[in-house]
Regions:
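Short, acidic Ser/Thr/Gly-rich low-complexity loop/linker segments typical of extracellular
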Residues: 65-84
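Collagenous Gly-X-Y triple-helix signature in extracellular proteins
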Residues: 117-342
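A short, solvent-exposed beta-strand micro-motif common in secreted/extracellular proteins
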Residues: 86-98
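A short, amphipathic beta-strand motif
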Residues: 49-57
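Structured interaction patches on ligand/partner-binding surfaces of diverse proteins
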Residues: 95-118, 256
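Beta-rich interaction/scaffold domains
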Residues: 1-48, 99
């Protein structure tokens, strides 16, 4: 026989190597026997043809090819696998209660990521904030939205302030649902305050006044119709100051300050492990900030406690050509430029 043994992925499904009948006779219906005249039998389990999709949890996933249709629902992790009965290209439709997206998929290819979302303008600033929020929360942010793009937001008490994209897929959502598509930050400093009521840093970022009170109330700066859309992300910071070996703790923050390494990619005065540098701050000129009420260069708080004393947190100081980390007593007042994610 020309073909008398079938293997799939290294597993023998049919073996007729002892067959004495010719291929031509088999084609005319003759039964295969071995040299002893015993009937040769084989079994063959056809492999399942599947289309695997990662999408929004609860989305309806439908594959269509001609008159054939197969549907399923994405589980809580956003996974859906459809079993189809034919190879080739199928049209995939994924729908939520608000959005629908379609794509062609070939059976047997890798898992397809397909998220229904709003119709976005490729220019970030041309979209309204509701569309930006929806794109983030459906994970359909266009590739054309780049780090460094900005859009104006009406900030309570500070007027119209530019908001910058400082990172894409940088921060982890606190609920474990993956990466926040965008991390945003006010371009100008919008508030002036203390890290703590006393000049100490033993409480670290987790328990300082800036986090527990100022940042906890900072959603007031966001327009009222967007506040509920701000999502908590995980931030890592030294548990205390005055120690180069302080444990790094993880907090869940909706509004947060950046660490030394997230801005400067250094740990000159902070412990390692407080995140990684945002793409935006790889451009040195972006490290300079002014306040909403002035054109003068502002010193702005970082959330990193200083590792070499028990009294200070770090500030970002811009010396005219580049930024550097400096120290400031915890009960000193400096400017803040909070960041957040939708």
């Amino acid at each position: 026989m020309a073909v008398n043994k079938v293997e799939i992925n290294g597993v023998v499904k049919l073996d007729l190597t002892q067959d004495t009948v010719t291929a031509a006779k088999l084609a005319h219906g003759e039964t295969a026997h071995d040299a002893r005249g015993e009937l040769i039998t084989g079994t063959m389990t056809a492999p399942q043809l599947q289309i695997a999709v990662t999408t929004s949890a609860g989305a309806t996933v439908t594959a269509t090819k001609g008159s054939k249709t197969v549907s399923g629902t994405a589980d809580a992790s956003g996974n859906c696998t459809l079993t189809v009965d034919e190879t080739g290209t199928w049209m995939l439709t994924v729908s939520t209660d608000k959005y629908t997206v379609t794509a062609d998929v070939t059976v047997g290819t890798n898992t397809l990521e397909l998220y229904p979302g709003p119709a976005c303008d490729p220019v970030f600033a041309n979209n309204d904030w509701a569309t930006i929020v929806a794109a983030c929360q459906t994970k359909t942010v266009p590739a054309s939205w780049k780090v460094g793009d900005s859009k104006v937001m009406a900030v309570l008490g500070a007027g119209d302030i530019q908001v910058d994209i400082i990172g894409k897929n940088h921060d982890d959502y606190a609920d474990g649902s993956g990466k926040a598509p965008l991390t945003l930050q006010f371009h100008k400093c919008i508030d002036y305050g203390k890290m703590n009521s006393s000049s100490e840093n033993s409480m670290g970022w987790k328990n300082c006044t800036m986090r527990t009170t100022t940042m906890a109330n900072a959603l007031k700066w966001i327009p009222a119709d967007l506040r509920s859309s701000v999502r908590a992300v995980k931030k890592k910071t030294a548990s205390k100051g005055n120690s180069s070996t302080a444990a790094v703790t993880t907090t869940s923050d909706k509004m947060f300050l950046l660490s030394e390494v997230e801005v400067l990619n250094t740990t000159s005065q902070s412990v390692s492990g407080e995140g990684t540098q945002y793409e935006y701050y790889k451009t040195v000129a972006n490290q300079k900030k002014v306040s909403y009420s002035s054109t003068s260069t502002a010193n702005w708080w970082l959330r990193s406690p200083r590792k070499t004393d028990a009294t200070s947190f770090l500030i970002l100081y811009f010396n005219g050509t580049k930024g550097s980390a400096s120290d400031s007593y915890s009960n000193n007042s400096n400017w803040t430029a909070p960041a957040f994610c939708f």
